[in-house]
Amino acid sequence: MLTIYGVYRSRASRVYWMAEELGLEFQSVPVLQARRLADPLAPEAPLNTHSPDFIAVNPMAQIPSIRDGDLVMHESLAINLYLARRHGGPLSGQTVEEDGLLTMWTVWAAAEVEPQTVKIVLTYDNELENSDGGQETIAVACRSLRRPLAVLESHLAGRQWIVGDRFTVADLNLAEVLRYAQSEEALFDAHPNVKAWIERCQSRPAYRAMQATRGREPIEI
């Protein structure tokens, strides 16, 4: 059985969404981000990214990780590419060319988009969005996102999905990366194709199931 290490309020959310899309049975092992704890190495601390038991799984001390049989993997976007290929179906590439495009868009999301969207979401997580520094961080990140969003806006003209004529792992990975910036409504209003596309992605039953579980997850775990 697939084991997912992480919590829903983290990058693990995209792996949980993928598992829901594929209809996989999985075990979830809650691993909290160490930054959320006053003393992550205290004897009473819950399992977290600095716990020795988790470091044995992922020496980089980051979530998510998975265990699938004898395979241990890290890096959420790579995990999703693996799960798509492992289980096949419409979320995976149907040709070598499609496989290449799914990988291309996933790497693009990681390199061109996520570095900026993470700045936005962490500003909110740290409750700095109303401070001068926080507002400047968000403004700079939004400016940096204009070019990649313009590229995506053009790519989505006349099409529903990123690759081919169906929802794939590329849509899931990119939608999750962009979700971190959805607090900035003007950014998406300026790119209507992107806005409509991410709404299609987030209307899927598997996404809603993931978000429902995320909403029930105790903050303190």
Segments and roles (model prediction):
Residues 33-34, 167, 216-217:
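Positions that flank functional sites
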Residues 37-39, 200, 220-221:
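Short Asp/Glu-rich motifs
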